[in-house]
Amino acid sequence: MTAQTPNSFRNLPDERGHFGQFGGRYVAETLMPLILDLEREYNAAKADPAFKAEFDDLLEHYVGRPSPLYFAPRLTEELGGAQVWFKRDELNHTGAHKINNCIGQILLAMRMGKTRIIAETGAGQHGVATATVCARFGLPCVIFMGATDVARQAPNVFRMKLLGAEVVPVTAGAGTLKDAMNEALRDWVANVHNTFYIIGTAAGPHPYPELVRDFQSVIGKEARAQMLSRTGRLPDLLVAAIGGGSNAIGLFHPFLDDPSVRMLGVEAAGHGLDKEHAASLAGGRPGILHGNKTYLLQDEDGQITEGHSISAGLDYPGIGPEHAWLKEIGRVDYTSVTDTEALDAFQLLCRTEGIIPALEPAHAIAAVKKVAPTMGKDEIILANLCGRGDKDIFSVAEHLGVSL
């Protein structure tokens, strides 16, 4: 662990799960004992060298970590400014960053003696990662997925079923991630005695935002060491896409106390911030959803509105509470990118580097495309390539007018 200083950006949440005014735990009374139990177990696991050893061993031999740090020479040349580097988390087993967190949480579930796993999923990546760890450890798995997402992420739905998971399509609301999460929370309340809920992003009631961040911060810890070893210094700018925000907080957190490192989180602007989008920091205001206080997309009456993004993994109408706090104190900058800009960036990376990214990190690449030309050639941008694009080729083809 890094030594904490009193004025560190890295020592929150407080004991009640707050990041400034954000976070907390707003849950049904039936869930509160379980949430407190989870917090106790997590604190015990953090102090247990055997837990860390098992987590690290699985990350190395099952997930394939550390993931490479890659300098993108042709993209750098094309953009004509700062050097562009990628943390290649799309090379993990299952093709995204989600597995880092699932490994940590299933170890916690088994430590707590739970025998059934549930999860929500949007793009299907977290569902696939959860189904994967359940198969690996022989536990039954139920995945709640919005009916809209089931339709647009057919390959991942089939993967989950192949891995032995039961996939429950959720038709409530718009049938997307928010609705799937509501349904998962309902199931958890009803089956609290034997069920562990593996939340897929750095949101939800405390201690979830903290533990998801801690499991994902392997990304930033590796990247920091790799960057120092390869270049002898830290990057000038970190860039990551944000839905709920777990890949971004995983990259950012180990660098928060390095004042020379700027950070940029990239939300989904969808059709535009004045139209349908999923940029809760840019277009939302504080409210309470899924057990925590954070920025949310809501109407005048405080009803949660639907997020829209070409990327199924970014259309959550909220954001992890730590990001809300980091925005409020000004430590991290946040911007947003439209569907069209993300599609252009998706194609740019394919053509320049031979890497097909997921639509989620394509948003980060679109932001890099804007900012790199404004920086010096001796400056370094490190972007998190948090998922591969296999799952998205059908929807990209459709948007480009190609029938497969």
From Swiss-Prot:
MF-aspect GO terms: tryptophan synthase activity
Class of this enzyme: lyase
EC number: 4.2.1.20
CDD domains xref list: Trp-synth_B (cd06446)
Pathway(s) of this molecule: Amino-acid biosynthesis; L-tryptophan biosynthesis; L-tryptophan from chorismate: step 5/5
Reaction(s) this enzyme catalyzes, per UniProt: (1S,2R)-1-C-(indol-3-yl)glycerol 3-phosphate + L-serine = D-glyceraldehyde 3-phosphate + L-tryptophan + H2O
UniProt entry keywords in alphabetical sequence: Amino-acid biosynthesis, Aromatic amino acid biosynthesis, Lyase, Pyridoxal phosphate, Tryptophan biosynthesis
Disulphide-bonded residues: none
Modified residues (N6-(pyridoxal phosphate)lysine): 98
Pfam families given in the database record: PALP
Domain of life: Bacteria
GO cellular component, one term: cytoplasm
InterPro entries: Trp_synth_b_CS (IPR006653), Trp_synth_beta (IPR006654), Trp_synth_beta/beta-like (IPR023026), TrpB-like_PALP (IPR001926), TrpB-like_PALP_sf (IPR036052)
Needed co-factor(s): pyridoxal 5'-phosphate
Function statement: The beta subunit is responsible for the synthesis of L-tryptophan from indole and L-serine.
Family affiliation: Belongs to the TrpB family.
Quaternary structure annotation from Swiss-Prot or TrEMBL: Tetramer of two alpha and two beta chains.
UniProt xrefs under PANTHER family: TRYPTOPHAN SYNTHASE, TRYPTOPHAN SYNTHASE-RELATED
HAMAP family, per the entry: Trp_synth_beta
Name the UniProt record assigns to this protein: Tryptophan synthase beta chain
